[in-house]
């Protein structure tokens, strides 16, 4: 009786490493290979079709696209907007957040089909190996994790030669730059990125400046969620994000260089272009300045910073993340209205807001103008009381110079 083949789910992106993994496990190890592409919004329909065709050519017995774009928005992107999350005040955590949901989808699929193993193409140098492995260890604890790229330490050329030898050819030419294109931005690695003193040339970006002059962009939020772009309403938040990306990318908005610490402790540098995240977060933060109290903004910033860090550090499944999400969700109850931005090549600025929850418009008075909610004597009394701790301190430390 023929021995039953073991099932392996390969997290398949269509790139060199995962292509090699599919073929090697099918041919050399005798696995029944299930190629699964977890899409968080970064793949086009054409790319997914090519992935399917190639997976079967490489030896997979089955190919599936696991579309988790809506889940990615509902369980991650939404909260990153609520928290105005930018890692180190710069990077919208594009790749980090996507990887977690890709791993979740792969783990669920592996459990569903009763897989014996899960394979992915991460190297031993980056963050992704941690994000994938940790998720699989938690959600598919009895499934073996296979990482040929990490364990066999093969060069790109060795992988290409192996594929060619077995009749599979594709354009795996190593370009100067490598890109990770996603719904929440595109990361750029390689080339000048490897030199701390250099920036990226225009040619390195996938989206180029197409517009001159300036225009206004109106982004409307309801309870913190983007609902309209230039007064065009969207029921699907993904389509709203894509619309903002289309408008902002034409001006080359959202380009920057992120320098941060990897999970394993080394510093890394990555270029990125992320028009939609930077515009949406910029508009949302601006609207919050009008609609939230001082302490709501302060404490939300603290927990949002932790949320972004935990997301990056592969701690999405940590229970405290659900607690932080609950706080962020509740903080948005009055974040309603339209933020107006001015777009121009490579930059944008804030203009104003229209909101029924605007706390700047108040019967108590306007900053720097005539007060209406208190008298001059009230103001003087408030100032005197507020100064009490300082007056007490310096009365007891008259020798201190200031």
Placement of each model-derived feature along the sequence:
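Nucleotide-activated chemistry modules centered on ATP-dependent adenylation/adenylyltransferase
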Residues: 2-11, 16-402
